[in-house]
């Protein structure tokens, strides 16, 4: 199982650790999406920035 993570809000005014988290996920701009493996580490990173992203489960990978 994989997760499709899409950035839906900008990073202006966010905490530095949230910006670092988004960079680690590979998200750079609003509307940008990445597909990551569903692991506890990725789930934790998404949980920290859940107000900035949307998450969908996708089959494959």
From Swiss-Prot:
Pfam families: Ribosomal_L30 (PF00327). Keywords: Ribonucleoprotein, Ribosomal protein. It comes from the Bacteria. Gene3D superfamilies: Ribosomal protein L30, ferredoxin-like fold domain. One of its GO terms (cellular component) is cytosolic large ribosomal subunit. One of its GO terms (biological process) is translation. SUPFAM superfamilies: Ribosomal protein L30p/L7e (SSF55129). GO terms for molecular function: structural constituent of ribosome. InterPro entries: Ribo_uL30_ferredoxin-like_sf, Ribosomal_uL30_bac-type, Ribosomal_uL30_ferredoxin-like. Belongs to the universal ribosomal protein uL30 family. Part of the 50S ribosomal subunit. This is Large ribosomal subunit protein uL30.
């Amino acid at each position: 199982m994989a997760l499709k993570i899409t950035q839906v809000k900008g990073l202006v005014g966010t905490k530095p650790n949230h910006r670092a988290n988004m960079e680690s996920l590979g998200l750079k701009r609003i509307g940008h999406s990445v597909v990551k493996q569903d692991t506890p580490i990725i789930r934790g990173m998404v949980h920290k920035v859940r107000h900035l992203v949307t998450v969908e489960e996708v089959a494959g990978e």
